[in-house]
């Protein structure tokens, strides 16, 4: 699972997901890509599940690029705990995804293979996505 080696602070504010993605919204490495259409937090587990789905389907052919990294820590309070006594303990890592963000890229395979692989990865994501091709 992906996570930062070290961070400056142990806990983080939740923040807002306003507007669309202006960085990471163009295909940079491969020929085909999966692009987010909605905003969401995507967990490290979901990123890994999508990556596995693509690599299993594409087998040895092609190369996969994961274009997002979970760098935001999410805290949770234990169940049936009273309010107060500080913020919860860090539980998992997420990547903040805005509409337009490229999630995965793939190259070196045919369009049909890429489309099916991306469809499998999209089913692991909590958001609507679209398949795009580099012009």
Swiss-Prot record:
PROSITE patterns: RIBOSOMAL_L16_1, RIBOSOMAL_L16_2. Pfam families: Ribosomal_L16 (PF00252). GO terms for cellular component: chloroplast; mitochondrial large ribosomal subunit. Part of the 50S ribosomal subunit. GO terms for molecular function: rRNA binding; structural constituent of ribosome. It is found in: Plastid, Chloroplast. Keywords: Chloroplast, Plastid, Ribonucleoprotein, Ribosomal protein. Belongs to the universal ribosomal protein uL16 family. One of its GO terms (biological process) is mitochondrial translation. This is Large ribosomal subunit protein uL16c. It comes from Landoltia punctata. Residues 1-20 are annotated as: Disordered. The keyword Transmembrane does not apply.
């Amino acid at each position: 699972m992906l996570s930062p080696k070290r961070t400056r602070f142990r806990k983080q504010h939740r923040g807002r997901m306003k507007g669309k993605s202006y960085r990471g919204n163009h295909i940079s490495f491969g020929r085909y890509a999966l692009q987010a259409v909605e905003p969401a937090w995507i967990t490290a587990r979901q990123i890994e599940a999508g990556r596995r789905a693509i690599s299993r389907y594409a087998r040895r052919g092609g190369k996969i690029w994961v274009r997002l990294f979970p760098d935001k820590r999410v805290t949770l309070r234990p169940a049936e705990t009273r309010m107060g006594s500080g913020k919860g303990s860090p539980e998992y890592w997420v990547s903040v995804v805005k509409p337009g963000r490229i999630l995965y890229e793939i190259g070196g395979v045919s369009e049909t293979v890429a489309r099916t692989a991306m469809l499998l990865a999209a089913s692991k994501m909590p958001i609507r996505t679209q398949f795009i091709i580099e012009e």
